[in-house]
Every structure is written in C-alpha cells, then in structure tokens.
Amino acid sequence: LAKDEAEVATAIFQNVEMIEAKHRGLDVDFFSFKDWGVPDFLQLIFITSPTILEEQKEVLTRFIKVIRKSIDYISQHEEEVKSIYFNYTKQDANNPVLNEILTATLPQFVHDFSMSADYYDRLQQWLKQTGKIEKTIDPKSYWTNRIAF
C-alpha cells in the first residue's frame, strides 16, 4: 500500500498496522472480516492435547490464573508496562507510533478466554464452504472451556 502497488491489505490489526499507516500519511480505512461472513480470529487461544490437559490440569489451571493476574497488572499499570516493553525490546520510548500502538493494544487483553463450540462450528463450516477443508467434525471433540473460568 505504501508503494501504491496494492489497493487492499487483509489480516491486518486495527491497533497496529492501521496506526502505522496513518502515521505514514496513508489514506486507510478498516473493515472487519466478521462483517463479511468470515469468522473473527483475534482471540487469545491456548492449545494443548486432551492427554496433557488431563495430566497437567492443575498446572494449566495455575497458568490461566497467572495470565489473568498479568492482564490485571497490564490494565492497572499501563505506563509501567510500556516502560517494561520499551526496556525489554530496546525500542525508543519516545516513538509516537509505538506509544499509540501500545495504548491501543494493552486494553485488548481480556479475562474471558471462553469460546463456544458454536464459534468453532461456524468457523469450520466457513472453512468447508470456502474449500479450505473437506469435512467438519464435532467441535466438542477438540474444544473445551474446562479451565477457562
């Protein structure tokens, strides 16, 4: 887009690429895939096998608890979190683009890790309709919210 070699970009993040493009002076707009029948795919999803889930349930439950505490910390200490980020990544803390991206991104972390089997069923139905997969399976065979709460 910046070199005028394309008119559209897909799978961009509104809180990253849109901000960067606007800072570059590009005339950009955003549309959500879900408004056009493509399932949303921007959730934080943790994946494991049924065996590991059974064998390590206690550890994984503690892991989710730590993630939630981290999200609390992010939301309650935004400036400190930005400082940690800039220090760790060795980025310029005065960079207005990165500051705006972080300001837009930090509130995106939420506590609700749950997803419905219906969501995954709609996703796989869309994948089948668009020829990406040949058959669908019962989402309950690969999705659980057992430790999401």
Language-model regions: role of each:
Residues 121-149:
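Conserved C-terminal helix/tail region of periplasmic/extracytoplasmic solute-binding proteins
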Residues 12, 32, 97, 138-139:
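Short loop/turn and capping residues at structural boundaries
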Residues 54-132:
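Secondary-structure end/capping motifs
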Residues 19, 38-40, 103-106, 144-147:
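Short secondary-structure boundary/hinge segments and terminal tails
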Residues 2-88:
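Pocket-lining segment of extracytoplasmic ligand-binding domains
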Residues 48, 54-55, 111, 135, ...:
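Generic structural "secondary-structure junction" signal
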Residues 8, 28, 93, 134-135:
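Residue-level detector of short coil/turn "hinge" positions at structural boundaries
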